[in-house]
A protein has these predicted regions:
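N-terminal intrinsically disordered, low-complexity tails of helicases
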Residues: 1-50, 68, 114-115
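Conserved nucleic-acid-binding Ia/Ib motif block in the N-terminal RecA-like helicase ATPase lobe
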Residues: 22-25, 32, 79-119
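Walker A/P-loop NTP-binding motif
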Residues: 40-52, 63-83, 100, 105-110
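Short hydrophobic/aromatic beta-strand immediately N-terminal to the Walker A/P-loop
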Residues: 53-55, 90
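The conserved Walker
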Residues: 56-60
């Protein structure tokens, strides 16, 4: 079993593999040309159906990583959420400030899906 802090090199043909169109659009608008190492690791684990725990520095892209990781589970084949959709995910943050930061990040990431985020 590899060490918990090991990083596997992953190569994808697309900048953000298996990312639904609304997210690709949001990422492009934010000038995300390629995933960070944390995002690559999360997307690879998601593609393999693995569970994971992620710990990385501030600014490493963790919020976008888990926002993308749950996207296909939440949306399925659709590109937008129904207007009357009830809550579908809960993300717990240890502080109010971090909860608000997560909300801001997911708000732009999910903008084109019709999703709402609250903190």
């Amino acid at each position: 079993m590899p060490a918990l802090n090991s990083v596997r090199k992953v190569t994808f043909k697309l900048p953000f593999p298996q990312t639904p169109a609304p997210f690709t659009r949001a990422l492009t608008e934010r000038k995300y040309d390629e995933p960070t190492p944390v995002q690559l690791a999360v997307l690879e684990a998601r593609a393999e159906g693995s569970d994971l725990v992620v710990s990385a520095q501030t600014g490493s892209g963790k919020t976008v990583a888990y926002g993308l990781a749950i996207a296909t589970t939440l949306l399925g084949e659709a590109e937008r959420f129904p207007q009357d959709a009830s809550p579908m995910a809960l993300i717990v943050a240890p502080t109010r400030e971090l909860a608000m930061q997560v909300e801001r990040e997911l708000e732009w990431l999910y903008h084109y899906t019709g999703a709402r985020s609250l903190s």
